[in-house]
Amino acid sequence: MKEWFKMFKRKIYNEIKKWKEESNGRTALLIEGARRVGKSTIVESFAKNEYATYILIDFSVVGNDIKILFDDMSNLNYFFTSLQLYFRVELKERNSVIIFDEVQLCPKARQAIKSLVKDGRYDYIETGSLISIKKNVKDILIPSEEQKIQMNPMDYEEFLWALGDFSTMNLLRTVFESRKRLGDDLNRKMMQQFRLYMLVGGMPQAVYEYIQTNNFKKVDEVKRNIISLYEDDFRKIDSTGRLAMIFEAIPSQLNKKAKGFQTKKVIKSYKVKEDVILSLISELKDSKVVNIAYHCNNPDVGLSASKDLDLYKLYMADTGLFVTMQFKDKDFTDNIIYEKLLSDKLSANLGYLYENAVAQAIVSSGNQLFYYTFTNDKIKKNYEIDFILSKKNKICPIEVKSSNYRKHISIDKFYEKFSNRILKRYIIHTKDISKDKDIQCIPIYLSSLVCEE
């Protein structure tokens, strides 16, 4: 485990602890997530703290002498003895955990979970990226004894924790619940702090680099390396390069403000079949590197019921990586660009950057992404609701504004159509807390609290 990651408190730790207490050996835990989000680190930290002993099998480095053990699981006593001798660790019944790290690299280990869980002597935690990609599961039986949770990049609160700030979000929760204004000066300070989070992002390695160096150029280098890693993965999955092309087009496609991601334009092929496109998007989704917002054709409580698989938008799972992707036209992004972004003085329309940050907050809170578009045929005007949340037996439309807004026509027209379905309306913007009739206007640094409310 990388020692420098120990400082980072992650919310998923409590989810893993809940699994351990409630499962009591009846299921294995599978932690999915994009590469470099910190899966291995948090799992090893959990194993050290919550068990007497543990064995970590990193399938990206172990040799065939370990992998071949999974070819025959008929003699578990031999299997466990071999592991203990190899790793020089004594396993304690019901007080040890075996970790399968990067389990997608050894599909038979994942398949073995069924017999291992049934045996019941130890707990099992699997971590993986690209774990649902077709080539990683085509030759095995997926065990039903797995409980899955997803690990995302660090959210804003986790980012503040990494900076040593354990009070701000608790105080902001109180402010949010009371709907009291902070005042312009304090709001500006909070916005600058949130923009710092957007620029650095939530990838642990990038956060660490910022803490150590306070140098945006070095942070950008870390993020570029992560992006290159993802692009290499996509080229391995899809040798035609189309998957990498779709990934690289995310910032430009969001900037176009189109009704949905124009996949055929991006891959420069209008003849490609719809099932091929669906397969590509599915692979991209399974990578956990992007967040997909699907168009909801009938915005009501069961948003998934009217999800349009052919109409969607793509967001980066990490807004910090999104920033680097946006300025990837040079070998590096100058500190001056980061400094102007931080002070909100860059002469560019970056509304989609804030939109990506809100999408990330929604996903981190455990929600799926949905949006809605509609047309006024009389005046030939298109309207769009950026995001829709389902709460209780109602829905909550959300519009994201990157600057001081004066109008909110889309959310008003949406209310005219679906007022009986709406619980609350939100505008997420860069200004202080306010209310416009029944519309809740919330600063973007409180966007995660909108999801929790």
Where is each model-derived feature located?
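Short regulatory helix/loop adjacent to the ATP-binding pocket of P-loop NTPases
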Residues: S115, S132-K148, L160-D165
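Conserved P-loop NTPase "ATPase switch" module shared by AAA+ and STAND
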Residues: L91-K108
